[in-house]
From Swiss-Prot:
EC number(s) recorded for this UniProt protein: 4.1.1.19
Gene (UniProt): pdaD
A biological-process GO annotation: arginine catabolic process
Protein name per the record: Pyruvoyl-dependent arginine decarboxylase
Keyword vocabulary terms for this entry: Decarboxylase, Lyase, Pyruvate
Catalysed reactions listed for this entry: L-arginine + H(+) = agmatine + CO2
Family (UniProt): Belongs to the PdaD family.
Cofactor(s) required for function per UniProt: pyruvate
Note on cofactor: Binds 1 pyruvoyl group covalently per subunit.
Phylogenetic classification of the source organism: Archaea, Methanobacteriati, Methanobacteriota, Stenosarchaea group, Halobacteria
PANTHER family, sorted: PYRUVOYL-DEPENDENT ARGININE DECARBOXYLASE
Modified residues annotated as Pyruvic acid (Ser) in this record: 39
Enzyme kind, highest EC tier: lyase
Amino acid sequence: MPRIRIAWGSGVAPTEMAAYDAALADANVHNYNLIRVSSVIPADATVSPVDTAPDLGPAGNTLTVVEARGQTAGPGQASAGLAWAPRDGAPGLFYEAADETTPDDVADRVTTGITAGMDVRDWDGVEPSVRTETVTADAGEHAAAVVIAAYGDSDPVFDQ
């Protein structure tokens, strides 16, 4: 059965991109070329929160993800949130939100969003799971928070 792992992280650095890279490193997905997809969970997949992703293959490979990414330039706070609602034997859904706000705000937004997304699809309600990550930056710093749903293992960029 294919596995989707939920990993999260945060980072503070002198530039916006360096903070994002640090957040990806904290989640252990920093050595992959991320391919972002929309929010449908395949019917045969399992979803597992793991905190930090395990080794998913060689550096430089592609990794398919749904990503919530919040960033701020200090002083400030950024939060990212991901909700998921898998359904037994049927497709499920992810919803993501991120902003310069509180973790409670992003949790409310992803919960409201995923409920609406399930309604749009006429899918039976499943109580969603939610994970948030928050980070604070001081003046002169940049900060990033990510919550990543990583689909399976990584794949080579080039055909062999």
